[in-house]
């Protein structure tokens, strides 16, 4: 009798173990996400929204990627204008992952690569402008940066939707002289209005 019970327990345990392994490998990919799948270490495919089954011990989810637009605020970068004025510029990048495979395998650290590319692109663009131009040409700089970054990040599976210069900070002495000039203009304008 004991042998009969033992002979029944082992198959039941094995069946439960197999069912547990199978259940643990069923995956649901939610909306706005993609899973990059590797089989035995090689790229197998990209799973989109829905129910999927991962082959146990052979396949693995290499990366779980958000397909939503993402916003990255980079710290202020020191840049030098054409007239040799050093200032700090704070940038914000709005981007979206368009190709999960390229995003996973195209570059080692995508965020670091975007940050470095943003800094060098900003330095190149501002380096061609004088201080006055850089302070008054935000839309032009934003558009130029977006076009350059979008083209460069295509190989990484990334689309740059927008670039914004959040803050342009000239050196303290130049900022003070600009404020004095603005006050003088306002004073002159109010004096001229009083004379009328």
Where do the model's predicted regions map?
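N-terminal hydrophobic membrane-entry segments
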Residues: 1-182
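Single conserved hydrophobic/aromatic residue that forms the stacking wall/gate
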Residues: 188-196
């Amino acid at each position: 009798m004991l042998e009969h019970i033992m002979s029944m327990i082992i198959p039941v345990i094995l069946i439960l173990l197999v069912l547990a392994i199978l259940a643990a490998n069923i995956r649901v990919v939610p909306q706005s996400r993609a899973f990059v799948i590797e089989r035995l270490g090689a790229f197998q495919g990209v799973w989109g929204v829905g129910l999927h089954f991962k082959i146990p011990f052979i396949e693995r989810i290499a990366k779980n990627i958000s397909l939503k637009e993402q916003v990255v605020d980079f710290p202020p970068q020191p840049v030098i204008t054409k007239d040799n004025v050093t200032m700090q510029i704070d940038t914000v990048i709005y981007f979206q992952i368009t190709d999960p495979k390229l995003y996973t395998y195209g570059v080692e650290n995508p965020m670091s690569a975007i940050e470095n590319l943003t800094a060098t692109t900003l330095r190149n663009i501002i380096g061609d402008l004088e201080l006055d131009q850089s302070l008054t040409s935000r839309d032009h700089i934003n558009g130029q940066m977006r076009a350059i970054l979008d083209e460069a990040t295509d190989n990484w599976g990334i689309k740059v939707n927008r670039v914004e210069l959040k803050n342009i900070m000239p050196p303290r002495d130049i900022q003070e002289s600009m404020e004095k000039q603005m006050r003088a203009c306002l004073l002159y304008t109010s004096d001229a209005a009083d004379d009328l």
